[in-house]
């Protein structure tokens, strides 16, 4: 790393740093970590997030982070309230990967320590949470924008930490050069150019071309790939959108497709055009997932494999992950980490080379609709009142 790169101005200064520092635990000059509610929930035995149900990621052992607070979009549905910088290229001081990772782990431990004493938190759960085994690079910003993202990933893998990297499809060249991660995501926020401009508010004028090139680049990746959709009533989940999604999915051929309904986090964001009416019901989401399965490759390629009603997420998987009638959407993390650290084995990584069977409680027909029966679901008094006010069978 050159002296010039180290001497550049920091990404976050003054009021912006103060504002973001109140929302995240900032690491160095451009990175951050944060505890999510599911981490605390699983520490208390109250259930994990959809990534536990679908992939076997223990929520309390997952560190949510980013090596770049900057992003090329200002999405209207972003529940981070768009306080982070926008950028089309890196123009700031660059922190070293090793220092970033060490800072993240230190900050994460400090955040977890703050949960000690919370009702239901056990010492075992707390100790496990202190030593994360997974890193969700989806906190905020665009991870692939960080110039040394591959070195950063290598440091994480070297510590036995699996990597789940989300990208918005605006940096196709960086995506193409990205080395294998445990699971690679592309956000598909809209099925067409006009809707993407409205929902994502991209800063690149050629955003649609960049996105489509990223779809092609994703199709060339050998590790597990996921196309991630935030479903918004009235914007991106009409019947007319189905053939548009079909074109994207048949080009990108992702191993998995996540349909996650809009998170109704509108409090404090008076400028958003979104309202509760834009949050699809669970039944609407399931119906849309079924339609996509029927249409993509004429129904020959994908099925609903798992779901998690609690967080409003449904996973479509390529049928090749259903081995001898049993879904294998879970991940063998130890096997992946052993491969990715070996220069020879790393080149041989393939999506179906590090699988584990999906537990029966995670399947679509499960009684708990993806909620782990070993956990205890906690329903707040406010939620109980809301459910009691709804007609039977309606959310």
Language model feature labels by segment:
Residues 117-291:
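Conserved AdoMet/S-adenosylmethionine-binding subsite of the radical SAM
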Residues 38, 68, 140, 230, ...:
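Structured loops at beta-to-helix junctions and adjacent beta-edge loops in soluble globular domains
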Residues 60, 130-132, 308-312:
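Short Gly/Ser/Thr- and Asp/Glu-enriched loop/turn motifs at secondary-structure junctions
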Residues 33, 63, 135, 225, ...:
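A broad, low-specificity signal marking well-ordered, structured residues that form hydrophobic/aromatic
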Residues 2-12, 18, 27-29, 197-209, ...:
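Radical SAM enzyme [4Fe-4S]-AdoMet core and its adjacent flexible, acidic
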